[in-house]
């Protein structure tokens, strides 16, 4: 059977449309997965479970050296703090953890944490990340995930 130029042209046009639709669908599907891949890579960039555990230990050490911030943690169970902060960072960074601790609002209620206290604590976390060799772009990605909690920590 011979095809006319019109039939071939229609076939090519239909094939082009089908390819365009398939590419659009694939792009939409993959863009929806991009955040999952990005967050999972943050977990990996932090060193996974062991890297996060080292970071939290270093952060706790930094807190213990701070005359301004250590008093806020005087009544805190260090083992629970270590466990819950590790869970939280693991979960936020796309790791296989689920945060099972209290809300930030409940954890910080009545502590009267000022803007300066909050900023000093963030500086301590940055110091800990520096000492653990966490690259600056990775630090910024983690801090970006933690920043929304600020409103639930200051002046409660």
For each predicted feature, which ranges?
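Short terminal or interdomain "cap/linker" segment that borders an active site or interface and mediates
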Residues: 46, 148-156
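Residues at alpha-helix boundaries and short interhelical turns
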Residues: 27, 50, 63, 112, ...
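Bacterial N-terminal signal peptides that target proteins for export
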Residues: 2-22
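Bacterial signal peptide processing site
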Residues: 34-36
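Post-signal-peptide N-terminal segment of Sec-exported extracytoplasmic proteins
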Residues: 39-42, 49-87, 131, 145
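Compact alpha-helical subdomains of small soluble proteins
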Residues: 78-81, 85-150
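N-terminal alpha-helical segment
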Residues: 38-39, 121
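C-terminal motif of bacterial Sec signal peptides marking the signal peptidase cleavage site
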Residues: 29-32
């Amino acid at each position: 059977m011979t095809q006319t130029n019109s039939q071939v042209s229609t076939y090519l046009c239909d094939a082009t449309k089908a390819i365009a639709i398939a590419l659009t669908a694939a792009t939409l599907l993959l863009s929806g997965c991009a955040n999952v891949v990005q967050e999972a890579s943050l977990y990996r960039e932090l060193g996974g479970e062991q890297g996060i555990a080292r970071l939290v230990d270093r952060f706790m050490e930094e807190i213990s050296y701070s005359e301004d911030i250590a008093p806020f943690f005087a009544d805190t169970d260090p083992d629970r703090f270590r466990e819950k902060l590790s869970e939280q960072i693991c979960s936020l960074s796309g790791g296989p953890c689920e945060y099972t601790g209290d809300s930030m609002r409940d954890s910080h209620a009545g502590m009267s944490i000022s803007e300066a206290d909050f900023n000093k604590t963030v500086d301590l976390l940055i110091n800990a990340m520096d000492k653990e060799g966490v690259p600056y772009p990775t630090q910024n990605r983690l801090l970006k995930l933690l920043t929304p909690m600020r409103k639930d920590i200051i002046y409660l």
